[in-house]
């Protein structure tokens, strides 16, 4: 018996990240190889032609799991009964634009989208914000959707997590899949803190395998933090395929579970680890039965505290910068 189709809404559907994302969703990479999907694609009125072109390509792939496609410029149509919402579209920073202008431009977008989700999405909708500043955009959407559970709103730190995994695998000479118990704390920005103090590779303690605190502080942390900028420098374009891949990883794990493995998600803080409530902050989690659960009881040393508080400070400033726009 075929499963009923799940509705997956994707914003910024004409953009580069979406172009790397939509074909994989239609192929079953997001929700499983036995789960039909209906794609509900949102973009601006002037982008509708480009979205239609992408949908022509989706049609031409003849994906067995793709049960239907909706193209719209209306958030209430895009989010209608959505089971998953991938908020990819955001206002990019243009030349000479102040950060506060970027925050307020995005506050407008994510307030509208949060309200639409609140009105029409499934009450169990899983929302992932990819568009930057992702944590604060997720916070704005969450605040604009008071009737939905706060836990439904998450921000993407999986790209930072995957970038950190790759750097650790290269440094330790161990396969990337063997690395466990990595955490990334805080904001999806250069201030986030990748933390491998308790991580293992093939069951061995990674800090002993690498044994280089100077590398950790002066190479590893800045490399992960500035990787996006390095890709723009090299490619002339921002990381789109790796961001799409991280979005797939994030939602697939949330829906289908991590089998006890740690992953990183930006989630509403509950006050643990000295991070105040009412903020979306990256923490290590495990997922099962469609729910995430933060990893508890980790020791926080002085260096980690400093890094975690630094990224928290940035998040609090961003939150304060949009508070007046939230009514």
Swiss-Prot record:
Pfam family, one: Ldh_1_C
Residues the record lists as binding NAD(+): 12-18, 106, 113, 130-132
Binding, substrate: 93, 99, 132, 163
Active site: 188
Any one GO MF annotation of this record: L-malate dehydrogenase (NAD+) activity
KW Ribonucleoprotein (keyword) present: no
Record key words, sorted: NAD, Oxidoreductase, Tricarboxylic acid cycle
Catalytic reaction equation(s): (S)-malate + NAD(+) = oxaloacetate + NADH + H(+)
GO biological process: one example: tricarboxylic acid cycle
EC number, UniProt record: 1.1.1.37
UniProt cross-references to PANTHER family, sorted A to Z: MALATE DEHYDROGENASE (PTHR23382)
Annotated family: Belongs to the LDH/MDH superfamily. MDH type 2 family.
NCBIfam families per UniProt: MalateDH-SF1, PRK05442.1
Function: Catalyzes the reversible oxidation of malate to oxaloacetate.
Name of the protein this chain belongs to: Malate dehydrogenase
């Amino acid at each position: 018996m075929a499963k009923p189709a799940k509705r997956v809404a994707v914003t910024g559907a004409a953009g580069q990240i979406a172009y790397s994302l939509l074909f994989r969703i239609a192929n079953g990479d997001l929700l499983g190889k036995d789960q039909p999907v209906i794609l509900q694609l949102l973009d601006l009125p002037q982008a509708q032609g480009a979205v239609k072109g992408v949908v022509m390509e989706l049609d031409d792939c003849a994906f067995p799991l793709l049960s239907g496609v909706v193209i719209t410029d209306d958030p209430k149509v895009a989010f209608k009964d959505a089971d998953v919402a991938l908020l990819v579209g955001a206002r990019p920073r243009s030349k000479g634009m102040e950060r506060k202008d970027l925050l307020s431009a995005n506050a407008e977008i994510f307030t509208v989208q949060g309200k639409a989700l609140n009105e029409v999405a499934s009450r169990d909708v899983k929302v992932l914000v990819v568009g930057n500043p992702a944590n604060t955009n997720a916070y704005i959407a969450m605040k604009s959707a008071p009737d939905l559970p706060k836990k439904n709103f998450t921000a993407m730190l999986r790209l930072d997590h995957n970038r950190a995994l790759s750097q650790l695998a290269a440094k330790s000479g161990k396969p990337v899949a063997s690395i466990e118990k990595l955490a990334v704390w805080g904001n999806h920005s250069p201030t986030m803190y990748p933390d491998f103090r308790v991580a293992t590779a093939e069951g061995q303690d990674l800090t002993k395998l690498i044994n280089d605190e100077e590398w950790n502080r002066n190479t590893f942390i800045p490399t992960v933090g500035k990787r996006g900028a390095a890709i723009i420098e090299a490619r002339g374009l921002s990381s789109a395929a790796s961001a799409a891949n991280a979005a797939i990883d994030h939602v697939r794990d949330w829906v289908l579970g991590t089998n006890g493995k740690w992953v990183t998600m930006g989630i509403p803080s509950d006050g643990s680890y000295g991070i105040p409530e009412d903020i979306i902050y990256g923490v290590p989690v495990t997922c099962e039965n469609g729910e995430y659960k933060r990893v508890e009881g980790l020791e926080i040393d002085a260096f980690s505290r400093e890094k975690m508080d630094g990224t928290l400070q940035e998040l609090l400033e961003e939150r304060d910068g949009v508070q007046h726009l939230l009514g």
